[in-house]
C-alpha cells in the first residue's frame, strides 16, 4: 500500500474560493463513487498507477477546486465554508496492490478476482467502504479544522482495478466530479500512450462562476417550499466543539440492503412506449423520458414491495428528484461548471392508495406525469427563491429537507443517467470503465447510475431483504428491470 498526495502539475499561488449559497447549503458529507476497470492481460500495475497519478495532476490543473481544503470562513456566524488552495494543494491518493485486497474481497463479496466479481455483476455494496475508499480516521474527522475536497484510492485485483472517489459535497455536485473524471481520463490516456500529459490549462472562468449563485430575493418564507424545513439542529455535528465541516449522520435503526437492477436500452424503449401509448392524446403518443418512466416504475413497485399501502401510519408518499439547473439558468451555466446547482429538489406528493394501486400502464402514467410536472416546474425563479431562503436564515445549514425516507414512505432519486462516465476512454491498460457503483448510503435514496455504451443504465435501490424478495418476484417490475446484485 502506498499513500501519496497528487499535486497540480502546474502549481497554484495562494487562493481562496468563495462558495455560492447553494454550495453552503449543500450536504456536508463525502459522496462516494466506484469505477471498475478490466485491466489488459499482463498489465503493469506500476505503470497504471504512474499514469493515473500523472493524469490526475493534469486534471487538477484544469479543475483545481477538487484539490482544495474545505475550511470555515474566519469569523462567520452563519456556519459558512470556503475552499483554500495553494502551492501544496493536492489530492490524497492511496494505491492498494492485489495481495492487500484479495482476501478481504473474498470474505465480503463473491470473490477476489475481476472475473469472479464480474460473474456476479460486481456486488460491491457488501464490501466495507473503508476497504475501497481512502477515508480519514474518525478521530481526525472529529477535530478537523479543514478537510480535503477529494480523496482517491486505486485498488488492483487480479485482472482489474477498482477506483474509489470520495469528494466533499460542498465542492461540487456529481456533474462536477464527472467533469474532473473526463479530464483525468483524457490526460491518463495521453500519458499511457504518448508519455506526456500535454499542456493542461487552468479552468475557463465560466466553469468557476460560483458568484452567480448568490444574492437571492429577500423575505422568502419556508412555506414557499413544501417538504423543506428550517431546523438549526438537524445537521449540527455530534460534537459541539467540532467545526461544521460535516453534517450529523442521518441514520435509522431499520436495516436496508442495496440492490442493483439493470434497465437495458430495449427495456427502456419498451417501457417508454408502453406508457406513451397509455397516455396517448388522440393519435399522438406522449414521449416520457427514460428518467420519468423509470422513476414512475420504481416509485410504484418499490412501494408495493415494501407494503406501504398496508402501513396505516402513512397516507401519502413524496417523490423527490435532484435537478441539474445548469441549463435552466439564464444565461445557462457551462456544462463543465464546478459547484452545486441542484437545489431545490423537484417534489410531488401523492396518496399511497394511488401510488400502490395495482400496476398498469395507466397507473404508471399518472405517476410519470406527476414526476414530469414536478421536474418541469423547477426553473431559475424557483432556484433564486431557494437561494433567498438560505441567505435569509440564521445559518446556511438551517434549511433542510423535511422528508420521511426509509423506513418511511418517501423516495428520493439521484439521477446520474445522463452522465458519460462509462463512455470515457482512459487508454493504455484501462480502456473504458466497465462498471460504476455508488458507495454512498444516503437514507432512502435511489441512484440512477450513468448510462453504459449500449444505452442502458443501472439503478441502485434500498429496501429490506424481505422487500427485495417481493421485488424479485414482481413480474411486472422484472419485465423491464434485470436483477444484478
UniProtKB/Swiss-Prot annotation:
Gene3D superfamilies: Chloramphenicol acetyltransferase-like domain (3.30.559.10)
Protein name: Acyltransferase cm3D
Taxonomic source organism: Cordyceps militaris (strain CM01) (Caterpillar fungus)
Pfam families documented for this protein: Transferase
EC number: 2.3.1.-
Biotechnology: Beauveriolides inhibit selectively the acyl-CoA:cholesterol acyl-transferases (ACATs), leading to blocking the synthesis of cholesteryl esters and decreasing the cholesterol concentration, which suggests that beauveriolides are promising as potential lead compounds for antiatherosclerotic agents. Moreover, this activity correlates with inhibitory activities of beauveriolides in the secretion of amyloid-beta-peptide, which suggests that beauveriolides may be an attractive new candidate for the treatment of Alzheimer's disease.
Coiled-coil region(s): none
Record note on quaternary structure: Monomer.
GO MF annotations, alphabetized: acyltransferase activity, transferring groups other than amino-acyl groups
Function recorded in the entry: Acyltransferase; part of the gene cluster that mediates the biosynthesis of beauveriolides I and III, cyclodepsipeptides acting as inhibitors of the acyl-CoA:cholesterol acyltransferase. The HR-PKS cm3B initiates the biosynthesis of beauveriolides by iteratively catalyzing the formation of the linear polyketide chain. The ATP-dependent acetyl-CoA ligase cm3D converts the polyketide carboxylic acid to a CoA thioester which id shuttled to the first T domain in the NRPS cm3A by the acetyltransferase cm3C.
